[in-house]
Structure formats: C-alpha cells, structure tokens
C-alpha cells in the first residue's frame, strides 16, 4: 500500500512540476504593448525602402519569414499567416506601408501586415 501511494504521488507530482516549469506561449510585451524588436525589425521603414530600391532587401525577406514562423507557432488556430500571399506580395504591402510611415520601425510595418493577413490565414493543414 505504501509503495503504491508513493508511486501515485510520483505520477501526479512529476507531471505537475513539468507543467509549472513549461514555457507557455503568450504575447511578450509590457502593459503598453512595447517590446524590443531585434535585427532588421528595429530599422526605420525608410531604411527598408532604401534597401529595397537598391535590390538589397534579402535580409528583410529573411527577417519577415522568421517573424512569420514565430507568429505561425504562437498564434492560436494558425498554420500559415500568409494565407495565399507570397513573399513578394508581402514585401509590396510592407513597402506601401513604409511609404506612408517612413519613421515607423520595420517591425511595426510587419505588425500591420499581420493584422491585414489574419482574416485570410490558413487555420488547418491541408489534407
């Protein structure tokens, strides 16, 4: 009986500890929605536009795809935030945003893109 009780406690306690210390995906920002954007996300939109006009937007493409991968992983009921929009379409949308808001950060432009893409996102893997 005593051995069974210990096993039962161990079977309940270990998963409980794992659950407590397991990272839980949530939106990471402060109460005002501020967060630190790293890499090209911290650049001004006007810097992106200049790079794009010179054919040097490849690092921004990579940054956007990495950001979208994280969004896909952390957004409930989302498999692919892009929906049917390809990377060139996304970069065109980002350029249009940045023309209107040249002093905004590139990450802020990408956030606006995500909001626009959200209704058209893929919510389940195709069968």
Regions inferred by a protein language model and the residue ranges of each:
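N-terminal secretory signal peptides that target proteins for export/translocation
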Residues: 1-7
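C-terminal partner/receptor-binding element of secreted or periplasmic proteins
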Residues: 102-127
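Bacterial N-terminal signal peptides
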Residues: 10-23
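Short N-proximal segments of mature Sec-exported proteins
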Residues: 33-96
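Family-specific functional hotspots in central-to-late sequence segments
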Residues: 2, 18, 25, 83, ...
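Intrinsic structural disorder/low-complexity segments
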Residues: 6, 14-15, 104
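Sec/Tat signal peptide C-region and signal peptidase I cleavage site
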Residues: 24-30
